Amino acid sequence: MLGFCGAPFTLASYMIEGQSSRNYENTKAFMLGQPAAFDRLVDRIVDNSLPYLAMQVEAGADAVQIFDSWGGSLDARTWRERMLKPVTRLVKNTQELGVPVILYVNGCSHLLELLVETGADVLSIDWRIDPAEAIRRTEGKVAFQGNLDPVTLFAPPEVVQQEALRTIAAFKDAPGYIFNLGSGILPKTPLESTTALWETVLKPQGSTN
């Protein structure tokens, strides 16, 4: 069973913007114009996320995933200055509960080395980064999850099967790999392709039945 929570930047952006945003103008303006206040908000988010995750672990969660849907909109310098410390605190304190932590940052190709610094056990990555590059840059320090483009599921089932197997094979040299999409499943995704995907993934590798 997988527990989850939103990451500090994503939750802060929803609080400040009031909705999804393309450019996060209000959030970034607040972060740049009132950095101390922004940091206090982020710390408060972490303070409240920790007991929320603890309750999920107590209820039986075997692992926890932290979702930063919008964190990739930050450049590497800003992510290091504003997000590295609070996200690391969230990761480390959750690991102390005895469960592994998966960290997902959408659009993370420019942040990989920083994400490793958080100490997360697994990095969940989107489809924009080559698996071999991700493995090389993280130097065997983390396992991976994800990487398949959700739009793939709109292709014919046989193509979906091929792409799933290709993705799994691409991570053969990683310390570990959890198959998943590189982002959330899209509305109107064809059921037959979804079924083909999971039948392929759940079949023991090398099996022909």
Each model region followed by its residue ranges:
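Active-site loop segments of alpha/beta catalytic cores
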Residues: 1-209
